[in-house]
From Swiss-Prot:
Role description: Specifically dimethylates two adjacent adenosines in the loop of a conserved hairpin near the 3'-end of 16S rRNA in the 30S particle. May play a critical role in biogenesis of 30S subunits.
Annotated keywords: Cytoplasm, Methyltransferase, RNA-binding, rRNA processing, S-adenosyl-L-methionine, Transferase
InterPro entries, sorted: KsgA/Erm, rRNA_Ade_diMease-like_C, rRNA_Ade_Mease_Trfase_CS, rRNA_Ade_methylase_Trfase_N, rRNA_adenine_dimethylase, SAM-dependent_MTases_sf
Name of protein: Probable ribosomal RNA small subunit methyltransferase A
Annotated source species: Methanopyrus kandleri (strain AV19 / DSM 6324 / JCM 9639 / NBRC 100938)
Gene3D superfamilies membership: Ribosomal RNA adenine dimethylase-like, domain 2, Vaccinia Virus protein VP39
Amino acid sequence: MRSVEYLAYLRSKYGIRPRRRLGQHFMVDDNILEFMVEAAEVREDDIVLEIGPGPGLLTRYLMTRAGQVIAVELDGRMVEILKRELGEAPNLEIVRADFLEYDVPDDVNKVVANIPYNISSPITFKLLELDIDVAVLTYQREFAERMVAEPGSKKYSRLTVMVNLLADVELLRGVPRRAFIPPPRVGSSVVRLTPKSEEERPDVDPDTLESVCRALFQHKNKTVRNALLLSAHEWATDREQAREVLEELPEDLLSERPLHLPPERVAELAAAIESALG
């Protein structure tokens, strides 16, 4: 049964309606659902996490390929439908939980999901803390484009830097609004995240990196020196300490503009600041 027909069957049987406050838009395009599973190279020895499965449209595809699927859903109505319709499958575990508070099992090695767009950022960074092989996710198109933006471009941002320091990011394809019921207000994109190993990640405290990055991109068109001074509260005790630290940093780095700094240079700057702060 095609996904659009399966959803119609569920709506007729259970009277379900998507809840916009939970960011529910159900993908019914079977070509894209299959594409996502293929992009993650889901195999029978994989344990796959799905975030926000809703009525189980993507879940059905994952179940045919994965050794185990763990579907984490916040909406109690959807959990009951999943249990009634798919719950007897031996390789499906249905969990009612807020993913942001959920303790992901250590043996999960892949994530495939159409995530709620209103919490895309916290979901992404939680996933990048996990020891997984790959995540294939659907994002709002504008968010996805920021993730892969080039230094100097209008969409280059703190998000770009932080994500690219932690993972290899690939924008795989666009998704039209009509692929969902109800259609979201904007287009979407499928993105593949391949987390970097510990050796590939920057050798700097994550909190320092985040605070420096936040300071830089609050004033991304100013020089690095001015951006760090204007947002000294983000990374230093006060402006006096900030000035002392800046005296120890390379002038060529301070005269750059955050908008043009590649992620690796931002990490280099954060490491230098961390060292100067002691």
